[in-house]
C-alpha cells in the first residue's frame, strides 16, 4: 500500500484511492462541490485543489488524482489558499444574493465554503447572468440562476436513478442544466437531487418557505411506507412533521430515499382520527374511550371465539400485533391474519418469506429472475441495487409477469406460471443462465404470491431454486419482496390463523355469510370492506380511510411518526421506529389502546410499558433482540404442491404514489398522481 505525507503526517493508504479520499482518511477536510462518494468523478468545480509533490508547480484536483507512493500533499499552503479563494470568487460571479429568501439557507454548502474559503468582496463589476427556471415536476423546485454546474443532479439521474433526462446544454455563460425534452423528472427517486444539490438551485417544492433548519426538532427513525425500512430523519416543529430526509445506512438505503417516503408526510396531518367514535342509527358520533370500549365489550362477550376475528394492516408495529394476538388468544379466536392482501406465506420457516440475499448483497448478483414483481414501484431502493448489479456485474435480469419499464435492461421471459414452470424444469433457456451464474437471485413479488395458487407458485419457485443451485452454503439467492412494512413482523410473531382458523379471505367470507360477528381491523384498509356490512367492525387506526368508513367503533391510533415501535423489513432486519411528535387529540399508541381494551374484554394483558411488550416479544421470538442485524434464516419447505393457474402474474401496485392511508391523504402525492399517473407530465420547461 502507498505511503503518502499529508500536511506533514505520513500515513499508509489503500492503492487506487484518490488524493481526496486519502486526505479524508487522515482527518483532513477538503472542500468540494462536484465530488460525491456515490457518483462518478466529474472534476469540474475545482474547489478541491491541493498542492502535490512531486508534480507540476500548480494545484491539482484531489478528487480526480490517484495517490502514488511517496507523494507529498499540502492542503493548506499559500498556493492552495489562493487557488480556493479564486475558485470561490468565480463561482460567486453569477450567483445571486438570495440567501435571506433561499430555502437552502442554513444548510448550504456554498454558504459554508464561501465563509471558510472565500473573499470578503468581489471584483466583478459586470452584469450577472440569469437563467430561466425549469419545470421538474411537483417535487423539485428550480431556481436555475443559483446553479454552479456541479452536475451532481445529472450524474445521479443517469447513474443511480437510471433516467438520463437531465443534462447540460450550452457553453460558457450560456451553459445550463435542463431536461432535454422539457418535461418533468419522472423517477421514484427524483427528490434525491435536492439533497445532492450543494446550492439552492434545486430545493423542495412542497417545503418551500416552510421553516429554517434551526427551528426543527430532528428524530432518527425508519420509513414504513414500503417494506425496505429506509433510515430516515423526521424533522418536526411542535406537533407537525414538516419534512422527512434520508439517513445513511449502507446496508439498506445507502443515503437515498424514495419520493413517496419523503413527501407523503403531509398526509400525516390530514383526515386524521383524533377521538373515539361509536356508530348510532347509522351515523358515527364522538364518544369517550369508556363508551367505545363498552360498546366493543357488549359485542365480544355475546359471541364465542370462533365468531371473532382480527386483521392487521400494512403499517402496524409489531408490538401492537403481538398484543392483539394475545387478546384474540384469550378470547378463544384463531381467526387472525396479517396478510390483508391474501399472500400465501406461512409463518413457519423464516427463509421462505424474507429477502434472504440481503438488500446490499443484491448488487453482487450476476443473474436475476423477477417473478410477479415491479421493484421500481414496490421497492425503489431495492431497484437501485439491481441497477448496480447490471452496471457493475453485467447482470442478466429476466422478468416473469407484466412487462415493465425498469431503470436497466431486462429480458421479458413470459407472463405467467407456465414460464416459471419451464424455468424450474430446465426447459427454458434462462434456467441455464441461473445455473451458470456465480450469484443467481430469484425475487418473488406479491403479484405471484397473493393469487389463489400462491402456495403452488411458491413451491415451484423453491424447486427452481434447488434446480438452478440458487441456494448454497455461501449464497442464498431465494427472495421474497414484500410491499408492507408490517408483513414480516406479523409472520415472525405468528399473526396468522391457528389450526382451523380463518385467513383474511375466510374472515371476509365468514362476515358476509353471517358466521363472523365481530371483526377487529388494526389499520387494515386494503380489504373489501363491503363484505363486512353484517359484522360488528372495530377499526383501530390513524386515518379516516376505508376501514374507518365501515366501522361501528373507531379507536384513534398513532401514525409511525407518533410512536415508538418495532418493524421488520423485507430482508428480516429488525428496526426501531422512534416518536417524533405527539399524536393528535385523544389518539394513543396502538399497543396502549389494546392493553386498555383487554381489561374491559376480560382478556387483561400484564403490560404496563412498551418495554414490557418488547420483553415478551423477545421471549416469544429471539430474533427481535437482534436490532438492525441480519440473522440466518431456516429455509425449510416453501409453499405446497399443486396446480398453477394459467392467468398471468400482475403487479399489486397500479399507482405508486397512493398505496396506503397516509399517502392517500397527502396533497403532494395527489399532485404526483395527476402529474405522472393521470397525465404525461409534459410542460413548456418554464412553468412554476
Task: Enumerate the language-model features and the residues they cover.
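Short, structural beta-strand-to-alpha-helix junction motif
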Residues: 3, 17-21, 317, 589
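Short beta-alpha connecting loops at secondary-structure transitions
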Residues: 3-5, 69-75, 177-182, 407-410, ...
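Flexible glycine/proline-enriched surface loops and loop-helix/loop-strand junctions
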Residues: 135-139, 368, 443-445, 574-582
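Short, contiguous acidic and Ser/Thr-rich linear segments
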Residues: 11-17
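A basic, amphipathic helix-loop patch mediating RNA/tRNA/ribosome contacts
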Residues: 19-53
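Catalytic alpha/large subunits of respiratory electron-transfer oxidoreductases
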Residues: 92, 96, 143, 149-150, ...
